[in-house]
């Protein structure tokens, strides 16, 4: 069955999340914020797991436009912030989240040493 979502990603509810999904009253995705970009602590909330599935051509075209227009650059680090594109992506199509099974799913892999605890089949 073909998904009607433009963009899908897993989330997990936790304390002190690095990122937090913002939803409206009917639980639809609105935005995602990062603790490093705000001036207050995130006490709890749904965070992303750093894994995203999307319809590449539409999202890539939009993200390229957002970068060219300097609309998704971090105010603090001047880096491109992919998560900042989500509020624009949702205007193109449906964003769906699925619940991750454990908090381990939210741990990022940024360095080779981060793979040590992972068990692969």
Regions inferred by a protein language model and the residue ranges of each:
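Conserved alpha/beta core of the MobA/IspD/sugar-nucleotide pyrophosphorylase nucleotidyltransferase superfamily
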Residues: 45-121
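Conserved core of the sugar-phosphate nucleotidyltransferase
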Residues: 1-73, 100
């Amino acid at each position: 069955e073909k998904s009607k979502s433009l963009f899908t990603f897993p989330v997990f509810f936790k304390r002190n999340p690095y990122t937090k999904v913002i939803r409206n009253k009917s639980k639809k995705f609105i935005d995602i914020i990062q603790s490093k970009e705000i001036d207050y602590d995130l006490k709890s909330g749904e965070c992303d797991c750093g894994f995203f599935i999307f319809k590449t051509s539409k999202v890539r075209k939009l993200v390229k436009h957002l970068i060219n227009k300097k609309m998704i650059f971090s105010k603090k680090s001047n880096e491109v912030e992919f998560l900042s594109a989500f509020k624009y992506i949702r205007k193109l199509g449906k964003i769906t989240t699925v619940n991750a099974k454990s908090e381990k799913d939210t741990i990022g892999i940024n360095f080779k040493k981060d793979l040590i605890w992972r068990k692969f089949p």
